[in-house]
Amino acid sequence: MKRTIRVGIVQQACTNDLKLNLEKLHRNIASVAQAGAQLVVLRELHNTPYFCQTEDTNLFDLAEPIPGPSTGFYSEIAAAYHIVLVTSLFERRAAGLYHNTAVVFDTDGSIAGKYRKMHIPDDPAYYEKFYFTPGDLGFEPIQTSIGKLGVQVCWDQWYPEGARIMALKGAELLIYPTAIGWESSDTQEEKMRQLGAWVTVQRGHAVANGLPVISVNRVGLEPDPSGQTNGIQFWGNSFVAGPQGELLAQASNLKEENLVVEIDMSRSENVRRWWPFLRDRRIEQFQDLAKRFID
């Protein structure tokens, strides 16, 4: 029997005005919900600009507990529109202990679960190790009223192991709130290589696991607060891929965009029958994957 889910993705730019950002997010969530979305996914750290371009201890003031003000705000929205909502927040767990945390709300506004980002980058303009402690909740799918969601965050999307563990634990969708873009000195050729790699690796997770993938990114130029660089041009291109990696929808790399995409969830069963990758895995030969490097 065919089973479909309508997914809303909100590709939005950000300003320094928190109130305006939240109002705009509310409008965009409402827009896709009213267009029939049952599941709505936001981008990484969507409340504010991407503050990790610089190291500033004052920016820890942006973090908040979970539950807290933002979870209250998004809980009301999820309940009002009867949607499952995937959000991405800067979590204050304790003094000096902070996480980059995805929080999932069910259709009644309750917190269905959360995921703390496991892989933390530390690259020019992406100084996340300064702000975030690596996650300690494991790769656990979050059970919701529409299914089990394998939610990870941004840099996690480059690692096949997380996607595979989510799939082995019964995830029905792989979801990645994201903040990624180009540095101003990159050539056009390099920009296209980076974007192509980003899309390809996630479509590969869809193929390898026989699951749909949802990836939602920021868009637009965000200046570097320190003035040391020209900032990040977030490349958008939020997309939904089916269980064979086929692109079902993809947003622009230049503009804000809301999309509502229908996913046929019954296809995963058939694809896994045709391509039984899970059946044929030689799990007794994979012990070396637990090593940092094999010298």
Positions of PLM-derived features:
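Cys-nucleophile CN-hydrolase/nitrilase-fold catalytic domain and related Cys-dependent amidase chemistry
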Residues: L18, R27-T107, A112-K114, I180-L211
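CN hydrolase (nitrilase-like) catalytic-core segments centered on the catalytic cysteine
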Residues: A63-V86, K148, C154-N258
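Cysteine/selenocysteine-centered motifs that mediate thiol-based redox chemistry or coordinate metal-sulfur cofactors
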Residues: F139-K169, T178, S268-D295
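Active-site-proximal beta-strand elements of phosphoester/diester hydrolases
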Residues: T4-C14, T101, K114, P141, ...
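Short, glycine-anchored, charge-dense loop/turn motifs used at functional sites
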Residues: V7, V104-A112, F239-L248
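Short beta-strand scaffold segments in enzyme catalytic cores
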Residues: T87-L89, T101-V104, E140, S238-V240, ...
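A short, polar/charged loop-to-alpha-helix boundary motif
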Residues: K117-Y131, K255-R272
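Residue-level detector of high-confidence beta-strand sites
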Residues: T101, K114, Q250-S252, V260
